[in-house]
Curated annotation (Swiss-Prot):
Subunit structure: Component of the nexin-dynein regulatory complex (N-DRC). Interacts with DRC1. Interacts with TCTE1/DRC5. Interacts with DRC7.
Protein name: Dynein regulatory complex subunit 3
Family recorded in the similarity comment: Belongs to the DRC3 family.
Coiled-coil ranges from the UniProt annotation: 369-393
InterPro entries (alphabetical): Cilia_flagella_integrity, Leu-rich_rpt, Leu-rich_rpt_typical-subtyp, LRR_dom_sf
LRR repeats: 44-65, 66-87, 88-109, 110-131, 132-153
């Protein structure tokens, strides 16, 4: 797809280009001046227009984490990439580019409007995560297979579709097929779908659609089952006890244990293993249930903490708003009085009074903020102690339960070694009646060989138990450390933001007063 500006030098999407675009699209007049002085943070930008820039590659957008609308049409972009951090994006225009495949949209789960018209796309796919998609523009591409339409049935919110200008739109059954297979579509190729035509199309393809619905229903059931399974697994991971609600750990001990699996053929070992597994799984289930109960306690502790923090902040903000409201009421009266005052001495007195009021407000707001900082610091410290104690108790009790797993393994090892030695003695004496597989009998050449085999199996089992314990302890300790660290950092950022807000407000009041003073002196 050639366009007049394709011959121009491709541009790099760098910080300079982004800053210029943000500046041009930012607030104007007084708000714009303030924004230019302080700089606009990319994370605060909600809409970004980068059309007709001759951009070849999407890059450097990772800081626009709160972006809602992105316009990249009329460039020379060849691939959809670099958008993974724009998770809040709702509207995306990539029309009039050189894109050949739909890709790179997996994280844009909030996208509602997507335009990819006038590109080189030949297949509709890789849109599955866009569950909120309402408008899809794919006109003037190279889509030629009607089966692409069926793919779009998975988007329940899709109401507007454009495919005109594609080879598929030239097919005789084009509209009828779409009307039948996309029954919730309202607009096709910029025209409202005729309800009568939709009913005719539905009747024509009724049998095929019924079969398709049956297959989709089965797929939906499997999908929901898998989603429920994954949700449960995520909950178990949050409690650090995933895969402990069954024989998973026990089975993993034998999955890599070649010698242990051979030894299971020995007479009496089968019954021994069965009893061992039953007891081992019971302990794992105890760890699992205890882990879930402790996770609930940690959640309650965290929720209570967050409520306390928000209540304290809200109460402090309400006090600040009240102080500001009283100040503004008095300040406005003083400003009006100054404007109407003709006596210079009286004017200077009122200006001094205004300056003192501004200083007093600043001090009051800063005192309120310092009080809040102290209050939140105390609350955070109490929470840190509580959550650390909860985690410590959890680890202590889990380690006690895992020690029981080790005791079971040690007991099993002793019994297995006893059976193995007795079997060796029977084989050496020719008293072994049971047939053993050749690879198992090969272990019984002498005592050292069989003792080493039993010992190797035991070591593998202990290592699996140790690794699971380390995984749990490391996981919950890391979670606790990161949580506490984030809470402290969030409070520092909140304090800095609040102090900045106070200074900006006071500076604005002072600037307004200074401008008034200069104007009156000149007059």
């Amino acid at each position: 797809m050639s366009r007049p500006y394709d011959s121009m030098e491709p541009k790099v999407m760098d910080d300079d280009m982004l800053k210029v675009a943000v500046g041009e699209q930012g607030p104007q007049e007084e708000a714009g001046q303030l924004a230019k002085q302080e700089g606009i943070l990319f994370k605060d930008v909600l809409a970004l227009q980068l059309d007709f820039q001759n951009i070849l590659r999407i890059d450097n957008l990772w800081q626009f984490e709160n972006l809602r609308k992105l316009q990249l049409n009329n460039n020379i972009i060849e691939r959809i990439e670099g958008l993974e951090n724009l998770t809040h994006l709702v509207w995306l225009d990539l029309s009039f580019n050189n894109i050949e495949a739909i890709e790179g949209l997996d994280t844009l789960v909030n996208l509602e409007d997507l335009s990819l018209s006038h590109n080189r796309i030949s297949k509709i796919d890789s849109l599955d995560p866009l569950v909120n998609l309402q408008v899809l523009s794919l006109g003037n591409n190279q889509i030629n297979n009607m089966m692409n339409i069926i793919y779009l049935r998975r988007f329940p919110c899709l109401r507007t579709l454009s495919l005109s200008g594609n080879p598929v739109s030239e097919a005789e059954e084009y509209k009828v097929f779409i009307y039948a297979y996309l029954p919730d579509l309202v607009y096709l190729d910029f025209r409202r779908v005729d309800e009568q035509a939709r009913e005719v199309a539905k009747m024509k393809h009724q049998y095929s659609i019924d079969e398709l619905k049956h297959r989709e229903a089965l797929m939906q059931i499997r999908l929901e089952e898998e989603q429920a399974k994954q949700q449960k697994l995520a909950e178990h991971k949050m409690a650090f006890v995933e895969h402990l609600n069954g024989p998973f750990l026990f089975d993993s001990m034998y999955s890599d244990d070649v010698e242990g699996n051979k030894l299971s053929y020995l007479p009496g070992v089968g019954e021994l293993l069965e009893a061992y597994k039953d007891k081992f799984v019971i302990i794992c289930l105890n760890i699992f249930e205890y882990g879930l109960s402790q996770q609930e306690k940690r959640k309650i502790e965290l929720d209570t903490f967050n409520e306390c923090i928000q209540e304290a902040i809200q109460e402090n903000q309400d006090q600040g708003k009240l102080k500001i409201a009283k100040f503004e009421e008095k300040h406005l009266l003083n400003l009006n009085a100054i404007r109407e005052e003709s006596d210079l001495f009286t004017m200077e007195q009122k200006l001094t009074e205004c300056n003192e009021s501004i200083t007093e407000l600043f001090n009051t707001l800063m005192i309120l903020e310092m009080q809040l900082v102290e209050q939140l610091e105390e609350t955070i410290n109490v929470f840190e102690r509580n959550i650390t104690d909860l985690v410590g108790l959890f680890i202590e009790n889990v380690q006690s339960l895992i020690a029981q797993c080790r005791d079971l393994e040690n007991h099993h090892h002793e019994k297995l070694l006893e059976i193995a030695i007795n079997t060796l003695e029977k084989i050496l004496k020719g008293e072994m009646d049971e047939d053993l597989p050749d690879d198992v009998r090969a272990l019984f050449v002498d005592k050292d060989t069989i003792v080493n085999a039993v010992g190797a199996s035991h070591d593998i089992h202990l290592l699996k138990i140790d690794n699971r314990e380390d995984e749990l302890v490391t996981g919950v300790n890391s979670w606790c450390a990161h949580l506490v660290d984030k809470i402290h950092k969030d409070e520092i950022m909140r304090n800095r933001k609040r102090v900045k807000e106070i200074n900006q407000f006071v500076d604005h009041m002072q600037s307004e007063l200074d401008n008034l003073e200069c104007g009156d002196i000149i007059d």
